[in-house]
Amino acid sequence: MPKYVEGIELTQEGMHAIFERMGHPNITSGTIYNGEPTIDKGALDRQGFMPVLTGVSPRQDSGHWIMLIKGQGNQYFLFDPLGESSGKYYQNILAKKLPGATLSVIPNNAGLNMGLCGYWVASVGLRAHAALTQPIPPSLRNLGQTITQEMRDELTQDGSEKITQWLRAVGNEFPDGDIQPDATALRRATEKNVRIDEFQPVLTGTSPKEISINPTAPQEVSVPTWNGFSLYTDETVRNAARYAYDNYLGKPYTGTVEATPVNFGGQMVYRQHHGLAHTLRTMAYAEIIVEEARKAKLRGESLKTFADGRTLADVTPEELRKIMIAQAFFVTGRDDEESSKNYEKYHEQSRDAFLKYVEENKSTLIPDVFKDEKDVKFYADVIEDKDHKWADSPAHVLVNQGHMVDLVRVKQPPESYLEYYFSQLQPWIGSTATEAVFATQRQFFHATYEAVAGFDSENKEPHLVVDGLGRYVIGQDGNPIREESDDEDEEESGELKFFSQKKKLEENQRYMRVDEYLKLDEVQKRFPGAGKKLDGGLPGLKEYQYLQRLNSINRARCENDVDFCLGQLQTAHHQTKITPIKRAFQSSSEKARRQPNMDEIAAARIVQQIMANPDCIHDDHVFLNGQKLEEKFFRDLLAKCDMAIVGSLLNDTDIRNIDTLMQHERNTEFHSTDAKAKPVKLGETWEKTIRSGGGVTQIKHDLIFLMQNDAWYHTRVNAIAQNRDKDSTFKEVLITALMTPLTNKSLMDTSRSPAPKTLFRGLDLSEEFKNKLINQAETIIANTTEHLFTDLSTEAFKQIKLNDFSQVSARTCASTSTNIEVPRTIFGSNTIFEILDPDGLLHPKQVGTHVSGSESEYSIYLPEDVALVPIKVSFDGKTGKGKDRHIFTLVAVKSPDFTPRHESGYAVGPLLKMQTPKLEEIQRLVEQAREEPDLERVFNLQSRVARQAKFSTESGYKTFLNEKVAPVLEQSLNGLLDNNVTILGKVLSAFPSDGQWSAFNSVEARQMKIQMDAIKQMVEKKAVLEGQILPALAQCQNALEKQNIAGALQALRNIPSEKEMQTMLSISGGLRGQIQRAKQDLTETLEPLQRAITAKLVSDQEKVKVRYEKLIAGIPQQIADLEKAELADLAKVKKVVSRFNHLQEELKLLRNEKIRMHTGSEKVDFSDIAQLEAQLQKIHTKLYDAYLVELTKEISALVKEKPKNLADVKRMVSNFYAMSADIEQLRQEKIKEHGESKDPIDMSDIDKLKEELQKINQFLVKAMGTNIRVSLNQMEVKTFDAQEKEAQQNLKQLDALINKLESSDAVQKQKEELEKLNQLLVEKRKAYPAMVQLQFRSEALIIHLRELCEAHQAQMAKTRNVRAQEITNGRWKVQWLTDWVGLTTDERVTLANKEKELAKFKEDLNNDEYDLQELISNLAEKNPSELEEAIGISKESAQKLHKLLTHLNHSTTFMSKIEQRLQSIDELLNEFGKQAPRTEMIKTVEEKQGTLLRL
C-alpha cells in the first residue's frame, strides 16, 4: 500500500513528506483524537501554520485535514477545506489549546473539497498563510472568496480527477526537483515526470491479447512461488548469525576436549569444527534442501510427509527464516568437542542462548518473525533436542539433517557416512535431490576452505554401521550374516545383522568391507554411489598447494567474518545453479559474437543498397537491380539473421542515408500495437520531432532515442522482429528490417560504458501468459540440478530446449536497465527479467546520455547461440495496479546447441540474382564494341611485307620482316579467318615490340610499324573482348546462377586488370572504365561472401551422439505408459493429452538433433523416429474419443448450474473459459487426427459442443451484468479502491465474455449494456469525493453529539445529586418500611438506574473500539426518545437525528442521497448549536417523587 496516500487522501506521513518537498522540513502537525486536540502551540508559532488531522481514532489512521494559521499578534485562523460551517465545529475544540487567543474561521464556500482536504491544506492553505502574514493582510471575507475561487479554478476540466491521479502516482515518493511554494505548483511541475495511470473505461473488444507461445512444460504439479527470501540477503537471519558469533561461536571453548585454538594464516580460530563456518553451512543446507524438495515435487516425485500432510517442499519462506535463526544457535552451547557425554547440557545451553537472543530483540522478532512466545518455545525445543524427535516437523528435519550433512568432513570412512546420511535425507526429498545436496556440500566445503574427502566405492576398509557405530560381518560361508526373516514364505533374506565393535569375531569371520557393502543389492537400489569414485581435494591443486589453502587466512576469515563466509557460500550456491546448465550443452569458449555467415553479409549489402536508393521502395515491395523483394524476404531476414552482426557490417554512410530514407517515407504511417493509439507519420515525425540536427553521431543518438522512447515505433518494431505482430503493413516490416541493424550499429558506435554483469528487463504480461512462463521456468529449474553420481544433463538439455525461454527477448533490441527500480517502480512491470551475464556474452550497449536519467539504460540484441536460462523465480509483491509481480532470474549461456539450423541462401540468392543485370549490361556494351576484322588490310599488309622483304637492300630489315613480321601477320590472318580467339591471344605476344622496330629508321620501316600497330589493335580488341572478357562474364553469370561464389570470383579474375587494360588502346577508355567498375563492384560484393563462416553446430560429436541415444531410449517406455493410462474423467484425459503433446514435441526435438548431427550429403535417416511417431499416432484416436465424451459431460453439468452470487458467476466464468480452451484443444486434436488427408474434416461433434457453450455464454453475460450493477451500487468509502479495481476487472471479464458471443445482434445489445455499466462506474467515481465528504461530516456529527452528551449528562449529574440529597433529607426514619410494603417508592433507586443507563449510552458513544460505521449503527438502533434523553436535544431534533442515523447506517453511492444527507447533517448541527443542555428528565423525577410522597 502506498505510504503517502490512502484512497485519495494524504496520510500523516504523506503530509509531512509533501511539506518537506516544498521546503518545510520536519514540520509538526496536530491531531484531534476522539474530539480531543493535540496541538503544540510552540511549534505552531514557529512554523506559522500547522496541518491538523481530525477524526483520528485507534481504528482509523486517516481523517479530515484542516489547517491552523498564525496571524499577527495573538490572532489565529482556521482553514477547513469543507467550508466555513464545518470549520466552526472545530473552532471551539481548538480554542481550548489557544488560551487568550482569538481564533477565526476563514469563510470559504462548502462543496469544493471533493475528498482532497490534505491537498487543499498543502495548496490553498499555504497560500492563505502567505496572505495572512503580509504586512497588510486581506479581510477574512476577501480571503474566503479568493480561496473559494482558486479551488473552483483548479477543479475545472476534470481537475478533481487530475489531482487524484497525481496523488496516487506520488503515493510512495514525490519526484525530485526545484522547491515549489505550494502543492498546486508542485503538482504542475512534476506531472510530466510521474507515471499517471489514467482511469480507462472498459472499451468493447479490447481484452488483453497474449503472446502466441505454447510452452510444453507439464501443467500437472506446482509449488507456491518463492518470495525471494534467502540466507544470503535476509538481514534478520544475518543479524542472528552475527549475534551467535559475537557472543558464542567467536569465543574460546571453556572445556578441554579439542578446545585448543588454531592459527590459520595469522588469525586465531577457536572452534574449527563447530564454529561459524559450520553453522552458516548448516543454514545454507536448509535453503538447498528446501529448494531441492520443491524441485522434486515439480518433477512429480513422492516425498515423505509430516503429520499435517506437508512435505519439505511446502516449507514457507517465513518458516525457513525461523528455522535458520534456530540453526544459528544450534551449537552455541558447546563448551568443547566432547558432545557424546555432554549432549543434553550443551543443547540446553544452546536453547538458552537462543531464548536470550529473542528476548533481547523481542521488539523486532515478535510478532514479525515469531508469532508469539509459543512459537519461540517450539524452536527452542527443536534446539534443545531433548527427545530426539528428528522427524516431527520441517524444523526438526532441517536443523538435524543440515547438521548431519556437514559432518561428513570429519567422519571416517567417508563412504560409510555418506551412504548413511544419504539414506536419512533421501525419503524427505528423493534420490536426485539428495545427490544435489551432497554435491553442493562439496562446493560449500571448497568455498569455505574446508577439506573435501574423496569417495571410493572400492575402498577395502571395514564398513562402519553409522547408526550404532557397529559392524556387519561376513560369515564362514563368505556371505553377510543376516537376521532370520520373520516371514517364512519370504524369499528374500533378512536384514543384515548388527555387531558391536567390541564383539570378538569367530574363526573365519571378518568385518564387511566398504566395497562389499556398496555392492549389496539392497544398497544399490537406494544408493547411486556403487561403482563410483570421487576425488578429494580441489581439482588442479597439488597436495601441498591444497594444504596451504586449507590453512590460509581465508579459512580463518570464514570462521571469523559472517559477511565474508556468507559471500563465499552465496557464490558457490549460485554456481551450482549454473554448472548443471552448462554441463548439459556443448561448450563454447568464444565470448565474442560469431563471424557473419553468407546470408548476413548479403543482407547487409541489400540494406546498404536500399538505404542508398530509397526510390526502389514501393507500397508492397522493393524493386532492386531487377529483383522484386516482397514482405516474406524481409521477414526472413528478421527471423534468420543476427541483426547485430548485420549492423556490424554497415557504415556511417548508411547511417547518413537514414535522413534520405525518412524523407522518402515522409507520409508512411506507423501503427502502435495498441489498437487505441493513432498512427504516426514516420518521416514527418523523424524530421520534426526526433531529429535535432547534428552529424552522423547525432543521427545515431536520435535513432536510439526513437527505439527506446516512442511506443508507436518500438512496440510495432519489436512485434514484427519477433514475428508476433498482426496487421502490419509492408512498409512497417521493411522499416523494421532496415532500422534494426542500423540501430544495433548506432548502439555499438555510441556505447562507451563497460558491459554490466546484471541487467533488468521489465514486461507487462497477461496473468495467463506469465503463469505459463512460471511453469516453463520451474520445469527447467526442476531438471537442472547438481549431481554427485548420476548424470542428469540429458534431461536438463531436453527441458531447456523444449521450454525455450529466450524467444521473449530474441530478435530485437531489448531495453534493459542496471537499476531494478526502473522496471519495478517507474514502469510498474508485473514481470521482471533479472539477466545475469557472468561470462560477458550479451554485449549490452549503453543507450546513451542524450536523455537525462538514461545512464542506467542498456540495450541487448540476444546472440542466436546464447540462451537465457531461468535459475530462479521469485514473487516480488504487488505492482501499483495491484498485480502480482514476479522476478525471473536468467543466466546467459552460450553453446552451438542454441544455434538454429537455417537453410542458407535466403538472402544470398536474391543478392546474386541482383548481379545478373550488371553482368548483362557489361556484356551488352562489350558486344556493341565488337567489330568485324578488316581482313583486306591484313592481306594488303602481307603483300607489302613480302615485297619489301624481297626488294629490301638492308639485310637486317629483310631478316626482321621475314622472321618477325610475316609470321605474325600469317598467324593473325589465320586466327581472324577461323575466328579463333585463342590463336589471336597467343599472337598478341608475338608482335614486334617498339624496341625492335626502333632499330630501323627508314621511311618504309616507320610506315610498316604504323600498319602493324593497327593490325595489333584489331587482334588485341578481338582477343581481349571475345577471348577474355565475354567468356569471363559468361562464366561469372553461370557461377552466380549456381551460387558458386568461388567460381564467380575466379571468372572475374580472368578479366584483365585495370593496369593491363590501360595499355589496350584498341578498347575505348569509357568501356575499359565500365568493365573495371563492374568487376570491382562484383568483387566487393562476392569476396566477403567467400570469406563467410558457417556456424559450427557440432563441436563435440560424441556428446551429441550420446545425448541423442539417451533421449530416444526413453521414448518407448513413455509411449507404453500412455497406452495404459487411465481416462476416467476430464482431468485425467487432459493430463494424458498433455503428456501426448509433450511427447510429440520431444520427437520434434529428436528430429532436430538428428539433423544437427548429420554432416554428409545423403538423405537423413529418420526411420527410428518415424517408427515412434507411428506408435504415438495409434494412441491419438482413443484419446480424442475420451476427450470428447468427458468434455460433453462437463459442459452438460455446467449448463445445469444456478449461481447464487457474483462469486458463483465468476467461478462459472472460469469453468466456461476452461471449457472453451478444451474445445479449441479438441479442435486441434481433430486436425492432428485428420493428418494430411485430402477429405474434408467433419467438425460436427465439436460444433455441437460450441452451441451448448454459447448458451452458457449468453447466460453468464446476463448474470454477470446484473451482479456488477448490484456491486457498483454497494460501494463504500472504506473499501472503494479495492471495489473499484474489482469492478474494472469484472467489466473487463464481461467485455471478454461479450466478445465470445457469436450472434452480432446479441453482441451489440450487450455492448450497449456494458457501456451503461461503464458509465455507472464513472458516476460512482465522481460520487466518491462526496462520499468521503459525507464521512467527514458524519465524524463531525459524532464529535458534536459527544460534546452535547458530555455537557448534558454532566448537568444532569449535578441535578441528580442535588435531588438525591433533597430526597434523603426529606425521608422519615421508617419510610423504608412503607417502601417495602409498597406504599411509597424510593426514587433514589430510579435516579441511580437512570444514571447507569445514561452512562452506558455515553460509554458506547465514546468507545474507541468502534469505527464510525459501528457507532452510527449503534445509535441508529436507539429510538428518538432515547436519543433525546441521553444527548439532551429537543424532541424534534431527536426525531430528525434518528431519521438521519437510519439513512447513514446504509451506505449509498447516489449523489442525490449523499447531498440530502449532507444537508440534513448541516441542519442538525445548526439546530444543536442553538440548543442548551436540557434537564427535563430531572424535573419529571421531582414531580413524580412529590406525588408519591403525597400518597
Curated annotation (Swiss-Prot):
Region (Deubiquitinase): 1-192
Region ranges (Disordered): 476-497
Protein keywords: Glycosyltransferase, Hydrolase, Isopeptide bond, Multifunctional enzyme, NAD, Nucleotide-binding, Nucleotidyltransferase, Protease, Thiol protease, Transferase, Ubl conjugation pathway, Virulence
Matching Pfam families: SidE_DUB, SidE_mART, SidE_PDE
GO biological process: protein deubiquitination; proteolysis
PTM per Swiss-Prot/TrEMBL: Glutamylated by SidJ; glutamylation inhibits sidE activity to catalyze the production of ADP-ribosylated ubiquitin.
Loss of function: phenotype: Cells lacking all four members of the SidE family (SdeA, SdeB, SdeC and SidE) show no intracellular growth defect in mouse bone marrow macrophages (BMM), but display attenuated growth inside the protozoan hosts A.castellanii and D.discoideum. This mutant no longer recruits the endoplasmic reticulum (ER) marker GFP-HDEL to its vacuoles, even at 10 hours post infection, and is unable to induce RAB33B ubiquitination during infection.
5-glutamyl glutamate modified-residue sites: E855
Mono-ADP-ribosyltransferase: annotated segments: 755-995
Catalytic activity: L-arginyl-[protein] + NAD(+) = N(omega)-(ADP-D-ribosyl)-L-arginyl-[protein] + nicotinamide + H(+)
Sequence positions that bind NAD(+): R761, G762, L763, D764, L765, S766, E767, E857
Annotated active site: H64 (for deubiquitinase activity), D80 (for deubiquitinase activity), C117 (nucleophile)
EC number(s) on file: 3.4.22.-, 2.3.2.-, 2.4.2.31
InterPro entries, sorted: SidE_DUB, SidE_mART, SidE_PDE
Positions with biased composition (Acidic residues): 484-493
Family according to the record: Belongs to the SidE family.
Record's function text: Effector that interferes with the host cell ubiquitin pathway and is required for intracellular bacterial replication. Catalyzes the ubiquitination of several host Rab small GTPases associated with the endoplasmic reticulum during L.pneumophila infection, without engaging the standard cellular enzyme cascade (E1 and E2). Transfers an ADP-ribose moiety from NAD to the 'Arg-42' residue of ubiquitin in a reaction that releases nicotinamide. The modified ubiquitin is subsequently transferred to serine residues of the substrate protein via a phosphoribose linker that results in the release of AMP.
Designated name of the protein: Ubiquitinating enzyme SidE
Organism: Legionella pneumophila subsp. pneumophila (strain Philadelphia 1 / ATCC 33152 / DSM 7513)
Lineage of source species: Bacteria, Pseudomonadati, Pseudomonadota, Gammaproteobacteria, Legionellales
